[in-house]
Amino acid sequence: MTLNNLQLFAHKKGGGSTSNGRDSQAKRLGAKAADGQTVTGGSILYRQRGTHIYPGVNVGRGGDDTLFAKVEGVVRFERKGRDKKQVSVYPIAK
């Protein structure tokens, strides 16, 4: 009497797993107002992480380094020294 050792194999491999397949949402950083644009007080001018652009005249900096207008006026992106940039808001003369 012979004993047959019959072994069955799966015809499809298991699903497995991976450590990839995720991505964080975009943070929508960057300029929110263009050079020469008229803005109102409190308007966001530039969203950033760190100080890529510094606040100039009539511009404040929020806790997350967001730059915002303090007064109504015209936006100007300017150079600050040789290697820095700043954004200012100049009031419109009435």
Swiss-Prot record:
One GO cellular component term: cytosolic large ribosomal subunit
PTM annotation, UniProt: The N-terminus is cleaved by ribosomal processing cysteine protease Prp.
Keywords of this entry: Ribonucleoprotein, Ribosomal protein
InterPro entries per the UniProt record, alphabetical: Ribosomal_bL27, Ribosomal_bL27_CS
A GO MF term: structural constituent of ribosome
A Pfam entry, by short name: Ribosomal_L27
Keyword Acyltransferase attached: no
Stretches the record annotates as Disordered: 9-33
One example of a Gene Ontology biological process annotation: translation
Propeptide, residue positions: 1-9
PROSITE patterns xref list: RIBOSOMAL_L27
HAMAP family named in the record: Ribosomal_bL27
Family label: Belongs to the bacterial ribosomal protein bL27 family.
Protein name in the entry: Large ribosomal subunit protein bL27
Gene: rpmA
